[in-house]
Amino acid sequence: MKVKKNIIYNDLTLLNALQILQKVKNKTLVIVNKNLKFLGTLTDGDIRRALLRKVKITDLVQGIINHKSIITYDKKYSATVDKKFRKFKISLLPIIDKDKKYVGFHEFKKNKISQNQFVIMAGGFGRRLGSITKKIPKALVKVKQKPLLEHILAKAIKENFEHIKIITYYKSELIKKFLISKSYKNVKIYKEKRLMGTIGGIKNIATDSNNLNYLITNCDILTHVSYKSILNFHISSNADLTVATQMKIVKSQFGNVHVDKRNITKFEEKPEHMENIVIGIYVLKKSTVELLKKIKKNKIDMPDFINFLIKKKKKIVPFPFVEKWFDIGNIKNLNDAKKNY
C-alpha cells in the first residue's frame, strides 16, 4: 500500500492535473475533497478526451471525475486485488475505509510497457537547419548540451520502454558511434538502404510478434508530455492509430476579401483561423503495422498512410496536446528550444 502520492483535491483545474500527471508513475490521480473523502479517479486520457469534447483546460477536475472507479478495502496486495487489476485493466487501485475516506493505493505489479516498441525516426537530412546538419545528423544536434537523441532516449528509458529502435539513413555511422559511447541497453539501430519515407521504415523493424503497439516519434520533437500517457490513451481508446495534435491559431500574411459574383462583400485584415496541427508522435496498433507491411511501395509517408487507413475505415484518434513542445526543424525553433526546453 502507498499513500499521499497521486492525490489531488477536486477544486484543481485540468491544467493543474495534467501537470501533476506528467510527474506520477502510473498516470492516474485520486480525487478527494478537503475531508479526504474519496470522489473518484482521473487519468491523463480522461482529460484529453474532455478537451476533445471542448471542455476548457481552465475548468475544474470536479466536472470530469470518474465516479465509477474500481476500489478496494484491502490494504494488502492480495489475489483479489491482483484479479481486479487484470479484469479491469487498470494501473492504480484506490484503497478506501468504511467511511469512504481515501487511505492509499495499490499499483499493478506487472509492467506491460515491455510489450510495446518505441521507435525513433532519425533518417532525414535536416536541410532546414542549414550548415549545422552538413557535418552531423539532426538527431545529434544539441539542445542544453545534449543531442536531441539523448533527450528522447533518456525520457523513454525513464518511462520503462524496454525495446527501443532507431531508424537511420543520413550519417548513420555517427549515430551508431554515439550509441556505442553511451552503452545503451535494449537500443538497436537500423539503417535504411534507401529513404523509405516518414513511416515506411517501420516495415523493416516490425518483426517481433509479441509487440502490441508501436510508439513512433520523429527525432526532432522534444516534449515533457509523458510517452506513457500517449500510449495509455491509445490503448484505452482502442485506436488503430493515434496522432499527437495541437490546436494552433494561424494568422494570414495577407488581407482577405469575400467575393460574391463581381462584388467584394467583406474585407478582413490578415484574418486568423484555427488549425489542428500534427506534432510528429504516433502510436500504431500491431494490426495497423501489419497493414503497413502489406503495402508494396517502398517509400511511404505518414499523410499517405493515414489517408489509406481512413479509406479502410480504421479508427484514428487525436491525442490533444495543450503543453508546449518543440519541433527542431529550423534555426528559429532550435534557438527557442535551447532557451525554453
Please describe what each predicted stretch is:
Residues 237-247:
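A short, conserved acidic/glycine-rich loop-to-beta-strand motif
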Residues 42-43, 170, 217, 259, ...:
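A conserved hydrophobic position in a structured secondary element of the catalytic/binding core
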